[in-house]
Amino acid sequence: MEQKDENSKSKSQIVVAVRPVYPRMLSGDGRPRKFRDDEDETSSQASSAISLEEGNINRRKPKCVYISFVTTLIRRLAPPPGHSGLQHIVETWKEPDSNGAFKFDWRDDISRDIVPKNCHSHNDYWRRVPLYEALAAGCVSIEADVWLTEDKELLVSHSWQSTTKERTLRSLYLDPLTNIFENRNVSAASTDDKQTGMFDSDPNTSTILLIDFKTDGHELWPVVLSQLQPFRDKNWLTYYDGEKLIQGPLTIVGTGNTPFDLVQQNSTDRFIFFDAPLLSLSSSSDGDKYNTTNSYYASTNMKAAIGRIWPHTTHKLSSKQVDTIQSQIKAAEDKGLKSRYWDTPPWPIALRDNVWSTLMDAGVGMLNVDDLVSASRWNWGWCVVAGIALCGNS
């Protein structure tokens, strides 16, 4: 009987040394494995494979939940897509070619449901669709850097090395604007004294074209003037007649190497205005020469205005920096000029949005932006949720 019990015991529990098969097992116990009556080495390894697969699935679950959470947040908080004629142009636009600017079929809903906003499309020509993207977002101000060629053409680019003969001030900006204003001013709603502007929701809003003179200003000046003259002839430009300022649907501002003496020169039909230095407005020697008869903007580099911005945990400007901004903006307001700060921090997103909010709360004249969609259509307070950046560069 004792022998029978022994055989029975050895049958039910046999000790076998098994070498690990799966890499994760190498970190486990190397001692001999014990199998059940109904288990051998093959079935044990299969069981281990299943448990490992289940483990991998379980590890993927938190990642899937996170992705689903972010996707839902973006879907719920993101602004709805636009359906205006301008947005249609953005979706179908093509680069200028040897035939000139991209030509589009006019639609009466060109700016339908677009609310104009005091935002400036910084370095607009870098966008996938210059001009139209900014207008579709509702930004009323657009920037173009121009370079003069030997044959008196105005090329648009941030640097001379990246210029191309097809991308000119005419093909990217002047010809498209001509097309828009011609179609906007064919009805009885517009008269010789009052031309209709860009936006249906506020046709009295003037669109601003900021032209950054990159080469010698005195050489550029007559060429820029001649290309803008057709706009003046059609009464589309804001101008100063020597006594009063008459607003048109398009306002031209010169910056960079724009010569202030030439801006001042035409005292009876001035239609290019100056981008005044914001930090000089409080100066007793220079401040008095800039006003609404010769200038439109008063701009400065953000760092030059308030010093370095440290992206610390609060993502906010110091109280001293806020006070400085408020006094600078007031100095511009007192002269009737629109303040503008360029080179604001693009990142971290929370810092960027707080700087934007601080500037708007202080009454900045024009918000200089690179990210059009975030600036014009998102609720800035929802751009970062639970540490997740839902809106960024667009």
Model-derived regions, located:
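Short, glycine/acidic-enriched loop or turn micro-motifs at the edges of active sites
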Residues: 148
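Non-catalytic positions within long, well-ordered alpha-helices that form the structural scaffold/packing
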Residues: 135-136, 360
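Catalytic cores of phosphodiester-bond hydrolases, prominently lipid phosphodiesterases
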Residues: 2-116, 151-394
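Glycine-rich phosphate-binding loop at the start of an alpha helix
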Residues: 128
